[in-house]
Structures are given as C-alpha cells and as structure tokens.
C-alpha cells in the first residue's frame, strides 16, 4: 500500500518546478483555522 501512495506522491516531470508550492498548499487551511482564533480574540470571543 505504501508503494501505491509513493507513486502518486511524485509530481509529473512537467510540474517539478512547482514542487515547493505544492508542498505549502496543505498548510493554507491551517492558516485560515488559526486566523479564526486571532479574529475571535480580537473581537472578544463573542
């Protein structure tokens, strides 16, 4: 099963230049999640 996931984890050759961007993409929802807490702290958790 691990071999199957490893096969899909590699980007095609044409997209190798975008590898650093693709590595950061999963973190974007986490930034929004943290932004919710910062926003609520700013308005006093109403």
Swiss-Prot record:
Membrane topology: Single-pass membrane protein
PANTHER family: PHOTOSYSTEM II REACTION CENTER PROTEIN K, PTHR35325
The species this protein was found in: Prochlorococcus marinus (strain MIT 9301)
NCBIfam families for the chain: PRK02553.1
Function: One of the components of the core complex of photosystem II (PSII). PSII is a light-driven water:plastoquinone oxidoreductase that uses light energy to abstract electrons from H(2)O, generating O(2) and a proton gradient subsequently used for ATP formation. It consists of a core antenna complex that captures photons, and an electron transfer chain that converts photonic excitation into a charge separation.
Assembly and binders: PSII is composed of 1 copy each of membrane proteins PsbA, PsbB, PsbC, PsbD, PsbE, PsbF, PsbH, PsbI, PsbJ, PsbK, PsbL, PsbM, PsbT, PsbX, PsbY, Psb30/Ycf12, peripheral proteins PsbO, CyanoQ (PsbQ), PsbU, PsbV and a large number of cofactors. It forms dimeric complexes.
Protein name stated in the entry: Photosystem II reaction center protein K
Protein family per UniProt: Belongs to the PsbK family.
TM regions (residue ranges): 25-45
InterPro entries, A to Z: PSII_PsbK, PSII_PsbK_sf
Localisation: Cellular thylakoid membrane
GO biological process: photosynthesis
Prosegment location in residue numbers: 1-9
Cellular compartments per GO CC: photosystem II reaction center; plasma membrane-derived thylakoid membrane
The entry's keywords: Membrane, Photosynthesis, Photosystem II, Reaction center, Thylakoid, Transmembrane, Transmembrane helix
Matching Pfam families: PsbK (PF02533)
Lineage of origin: Bacteria, Bacillati, Cyanobacteriota, Cyanophyceae, Synechococcales
């Amino acid at each position: 099963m691990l071999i199957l996931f490893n096969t899909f984890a590699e980007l095609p050759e044409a997209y190798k230049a975008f590898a650093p961007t693709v590595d950061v993409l999963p973190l974007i929802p986490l930034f929004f999640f943290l932004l919710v807490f910062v926003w609520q702290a700013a308005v006093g958790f109403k």
